[in-house]
Curated annotation (Swiss-Prot):
Phosphorylated by host PKC and by an unknown kinase. Pfam families: PP_M1 (PF03012). Non catalytic polymerase cofactor and regulatory protein that plays a role in viral transcription and replication. Stabilizes the RNA polymerase L to the N-RNA template and binds the soluble protein N, preventing it from encapsidating non-genomic RNA. Also inhibits host IFN-alpha and IFN-beta signaling by binding and retaining phosphorylated STAT1 in the cytoplasm or by inhibiting the DNA binding of STAT1 in the nucleus. Might be involved, through interaction with host dynein, in intracellular microtubule-dependent virus transport of incoming virus from the synapse toward the cell body. One of its GO terms (biological process) is symbiont-mediated suppression of host JAK-STAT cascade via inhibition of STAT2 activity. A motif (Nuclear localization signal) lies at residues 211-214. The lineage of its organism: Viruses, Riboviria, Orthornavirae, Negarnaviricota, Haploviricotina. The modification Phosphoserine is found at residues 63-64, 162, 210, 271. Residues 158-169 have a biased composition (Polar residues). Belongs to the lyssavirus protein P family. Gene3D superfamilies: 6.10.140.1560, Phosphoprotein, C-terminal domain. It comes from Rabies virus (strain China/MRV) (RABV). This is Phosphoprotein. GO terms for cellular component: host cell; host cell cytoplasm; host cell nucleus; virion component. A motif (Nuclear export signal) lies at residues 49-58.
Amino acid sequence: MSKIFVNPSAIRAGLADLEMAEETVDLINRNIEDNQAHLQGEPIEVDDLPEDMKRLHLDDEKSSNLGEMVRVGEGKYREDFQMDEGEDPNLLFQSYLDNVGVQIVRQMRSGERFLKIWSQTVEEIVSYVTVNFPNPPRRSSENKSTQTTGRELKKETTSAFSQRESQPSKARMVAQVAPGPPALEWSATNEEDDLSVEAEIAHQIAESFSKKYKFPSRSSGIFLYNFEQLKMNLDDIVKEAKNVPGVTRLAHDGSKIPLRCVLGYVALANSKKFQLLVEADKLSKIMQDDLNRYTSC
């Protein structure tokens, strides 16, 4: 008959587990007793209550106090919606606008139309500004205000004009540096630069993000390429696409933009693989034809 030997350490471990289990049970029982301590006292009979308790009622002052408490609570809710005094409103507003932009892109990717999204977004932004940015006090001198406004408008006009001139020059610079189509003759210029235009361009690109377009190959054939192969963020693609002449105007009018031309331009400036595969002269002609066809409609 075989003998079974038990390791003493296993016995000690089992005893320790039993002790811990007993302590756990005791702790649970104590917690239950503490939680039910209010039930262990003697019950209060209704007949033992003072006679004055039967005549208790709420008067008008109490009800008015309740109304004041409700109004205070509502005021506290409005204060919670507003910003703290120690926080910079400009930074918070910038963060809010960034979140709004991300939300717009997500809604457009889900299939919602831009005009509906934009109308709702404008209402939200107006509400935010109304709550957090009250009207500043008027200046006593109208001449100072007029002079300041004139200087600001002049600065904004100068900066906007310099930005518009820098966009075509940037496009020409990219076309010259990159080993792509050097002979593109683009006469149109981008003049609109607002969020609605960027959103429309992003919407059209996002809808065709995986669609493959035909491009001329160096091997006298064709190859397929799409926006997804760029490995770029949608925002960066939109910024590059705005440098293509005529794209901003088409997006502002709600027309279709030449996506193959845009893809060729962005890929030529950012993808070395695309530069090695594509035939530069043929690509130049294709991009020019696409641009002329879309802008002439």
